């Protein structure tokens, strides 16, 4: 069966309802509501917003691992290959999402002595410049 845009329609899954405490069984990625509601971020793609949420999740692991630079800023390592796998996207899409987040200032990416890139996930609610 073909949909409007020429893609095959997905088969509807036969799933159960949530009962009682089952609704609390999952862990979740953090996606700040402001990324959806704040006009500063209205032009960012939803995929890039999701990537930012994944980066926030990785940042908590970085804190536990002691990944801080000489200025005590926490950073993450997130390869293109991992982004592609996590979001089921092409290399071009992953690169474009990183560029989009970097262009608006949500992340900074630095190359350290030929090693893997490190990414600083920026805190947009800490009183920084209004975009």
Indicate residue ranges for each PLM-predicted region.
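Short recognition helix of helix-turn-helix/winged-helix DNA-binding domains
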Residues: 1-81
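Winged helix-turn-helix DNA-binding recognition segment
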Residues: 59-121
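Short, amphipathic alpha-helical interaction segments positioned at domain boundaries
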Residues: 125-131
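Intrinsic disorder/low-complexity segments enriched in polar/small residues
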Residues: 3-5, 103, 131
């Amino acid at each position: 069966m073909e949909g409007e845009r020429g893609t095959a329609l997905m088969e509807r899954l036969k799933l159960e309802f949530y009962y009682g405490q089952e609704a609390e069984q999952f862990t979740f990625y953090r996606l700040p509501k402001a990324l959806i509601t704040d006009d500063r971020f209205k032009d960012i793609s939803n995929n890039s917003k999701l990537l930012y949420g994944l980066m926030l999740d990785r940042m908590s692991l970085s804190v536990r691992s002691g990944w801080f630079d000489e200025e005590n800023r926490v950073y993450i390592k997130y390869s293109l290959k991992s982004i592609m796998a996590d979001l089921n996207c092409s290399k071009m899409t992953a690169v474009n999402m990183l560029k989009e987040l970097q262009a608006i200032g949500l992340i900074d990416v630095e190359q350290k002595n030929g090693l893997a890139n490190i990414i600083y996930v920026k805190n947009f609610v800490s009183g920084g410049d209004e975009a």
